[in-house]
Regions:
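Bilobed "Venus flytrap"/periplasmic-binding protein-like clamshell domains
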Residues: 2-35, 90-141, 145
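Translation machinery proteins
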Residues: 23-42, 46, 57, 73-82
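N-terminal organellar transit peptides
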Residues: 25-34, 150, 165, 169-171, ...
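Ligand-binding pocket segment of bilobal, Venus flytrap-like solute-binding proteins
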Residues: 31-36, 140, 147-160, 164
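Short helices/loops that flank or line small-molecule/ion binding pockets
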Residues: 34-38, 45-61, 124, 136-147
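Beta->alpha turn/N-cap motifs
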Residues: 48-50, 59-71, 152-157
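Periplasmic-binding protein-like
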Residues: 85-93, 158-159, 163-178
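Single conserved hydrophobic/aromatic residue that forms the stacking wall/gate
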Residues: 176-188
Length: 188
């Protein structure tokens, strides 16, 4: 099973451990990227969240836990099997409090979710210029690099603390388990 490194992967592992699928070594104390419990027949691969779907799609992992945002952005050939009920967030367009859209020019959008942003703005017929960033997305409109951002939002605290507001929410982002189509065909 491919688990995303970080808070959501840790929460999912804790849940799995509580139902008997923990590891023989201390998951939280190791820096190993593969941890297992041979007696339970489970092995966890700890990978970057954006790589979970790739490991599953190519058969290196039978199943993975990944956020809807990552799954959508990656466009991987995997099935969305189950909403785990964890990691409830939403994909949003956010902007400075005083932002006013000017339809006479393309919107400058900063995001790490390029495919999701393009798809959303295409669906509303709006021209955009994408600025690909890998972190601290909220900084872009503050420094005038972009008009708006497209990012995942859980509570909105980071937006508010940086003088930004949600303009629109357009996609829920939940944590999913995702088997590859190849695995689904094998299990039939």
């Amino acid at each position: 099973m491919a688990l995303p490194k970080g808070r959501l992967g840790d929460r999912m592992y804790d849940l799995l451990a509580r139902i008997g699928y923990g590891c023989t070594e201390d998951y939280n104390a190791t820096r190993k990227l593969v941890v297992e419990n041979p007696a339970a027949g489970i092995r966890y691969f700890l990978v970057k969240p954006s790589d979970v779907a790739i490991y599953v799609e190519h058969g290196a992992a039978d199943v993975g836990i990944v956020g809807k945002d990552i799954l959508t952005e990656a466009s991987a050939d995997v099935y969305e099997l189950l909403d785990t009920g964890l990691g409830r967030c939403r994909m949003c367009v956010a902007a400075p409090a005083d932002y006013k859209d000017d339809p006479s020019r393309p919107v400058r959008v900063a995001t790490k979710f390029v495919n999701i942003a393009k798809s959303y703005y295409a669906s509303i017929g709006r021209d955009i210029d994408i600025i690909k960033l890998n972190g601290s997305i909220e900084l872009a409109p503050i420094l005038g690099l972009s008009d708006v951002i497209v990012d995942i939002v859980e509570t909105g605290t980071t937006l508010r603390e940086n003088g930004l507001r949600v303009v629109t929410e357009f996609m829920p982002c939940l944590l999913y388990t995702s088997p590859s189509p190849r695995d689904m065909r094998r299990s039939r």
